[in-house]
Amino acid sequence: ALWKDVLKKIGTVALHAGKAALGAVADTISQ
């Protein structure tokens, strides 16, 4: 189930990227 590990890694990276993007948007709006 190597592809499961790959999907998990991609999902984790996407999640962190999404959180970072949301944080940047929130900072921009708050300013």
Curated annotation (Swiss-Prot):
Q: What is the lineage of its organism?
A: Eukaryota, Metazoa, Chordata, Craniata, Vertebrata
Cellular component aspect of the GO annotation = extracellular region
* Chain segments annotated as coiled-coil in the UniProt record: none
Q: What tissue expression does the UniProt record report for this protein?
A: Expressed by the skin glands.
* Keyword Secreted listed: yes
Return any one Pfam family short name. Answer: DD_K
A Gene Ontology annotation in the biological process aspect, one of them, is: defense response to bacterium
What name is this protein filed under? Dermaseptin-TA1
Q: Which residues carry this modification: Glutamine amide?
A: 31
Q: Give the function comment from the record.
A: Antimicrobial peptide, active against the Gram-positive bacterium S.aureus, and the Gram-negative bacteria E.coli and P.aeruginosa. Has hemolytic activity at 286 uM.
Q: Where can this protein be found?
A: Secreted
Sorted alphabetically, which keywords does the UniProt record give?
Amidation, Amphibian defense peptide, Antibiotic, Antimicrobial, Cytolysis, Hemolysis, Secreted
- Which organism is the protein's source? Phyllomedusa tarsius
| Tagged with keyword Cytoplasm | no
